[in-house]
Amino acid sequence: MGEILDGKKLARELGEKLGSEVDSLKEHGVSPKLCVINIGDDPASKVYVASKKRKAEKLGIKQVVYQLPADESEEDVLKLIDSLNADPEVSSLMVQLPVPPQINADRVIERIDPEKDVDCLTPANIGRLWQGKHFVEPATAAGIIALLDHYQIDLTGKNAVIVGRSNIVGKPLAALMLERNASVSILHSRSRNLADLTKQADILVCAVGKAEMIKADMVKEGAVVIDVGINRVDGHLVGDVDFAPVKEKASWITPVPGGVGPLTVEFLMEEVIKLTRRQHGLD
């Protein structure tokens, strides 16, 4: 039976460390500031923005949310990004995704100064990530690596299989796992013989947003299973992994909720602090 990878516990420990780091920055006369641009009324986005704001306030990080109407023009969004790029008090900047259809998400993200790109989504920072020369990492991917480190799960030589190829989890996590000398495969909706491939995984990560799609017969005995999915079924939150049966086969497994989720916001705040330190020559 698998042991639990407790993201909540690690998030609490990290929160204490981050609070001390913010205090240290303020002793140098530096105050971290995160600006979030949220366009429209997507319910999930509003929940995530609110959770970030609560965490930022708790740590002493200033967060400013620019809540724009759903019919905002792309031109006006680009102008706002330009002004925030130019503001020396703004240490980090992100555009909450998804954006409304009249706005080209790629153009908007590319406009962000890479030095303030807290989500690590600009082409320059994606390139640095794959070169192993990054100074910022996407929060969820960074949180997963930290969780594995915390439980002393070595990736060297392991077969890591990631189900999901998003720019915010699957692809950057693959880059970070390659840095740790894992052999990485990325699977997706067009992958053939999915179960045959997932059963080869020493480390199996699922990040597709499809409730309980990973069944026990798709998992190798003794695998480490990381569930990034958050799905609501009959009023309850469940992951992408059929938790109870898979737990019987896994050596380690993340629960939903309480696994990867709590780490995402914590690591976003860590990225804010890292960018702030870098901009002020304190890294």
From Swiss-Prot:
Its EC number is 1.5.1.5, 3.5.4.9. Keywords: Amino-acid biosynthesis, Histidine biosynthesis, Hydrolase, Methionine biosynthesis, Multifunctional enzyme, NADP, One-carbon metabolism, Oxidoreductase, Purine biosynthesis. Pathway: One-carbon metabolism; tetrahydrofolate interconversion. This is Bifunctional protein FolD. It catalyses: (6R)-5,10-methylene-5,6,7,8-tetrahydrofolate + NADP(+) = (6R)-5,10-methenyltetrahydrofolate + NADPH; (6R)-5,10-methenyltetrahydrofolate + H2O = (6R)-10-formyltetrahydrofolate + H(+). InterPro entries: Aminoacid_DH-like_N_sf, NAD(P)-bd_dom_sf, THF_DH/CycHdrlase, THF_DH/CycHdrlase_cat_dom, THF_DH/CycHdrlase_CS, THF_DH/CycHdrlase_NAD-bd_dom. Pfam families: THF_DHG_CYH, THF_DHG_CYH_C. Catalyzes the oxidation of 5,10-methylenetetrahydrofolate to 5,10-methenyltetrahydrofolate and then the hydrolysis of 5,10-methenyltetrahydrofolate to 10-formyltetrahydrofolate. Belongs to the tetrahydrofolate dehydrogenase/cyclohydrolase family. The gene is folD.
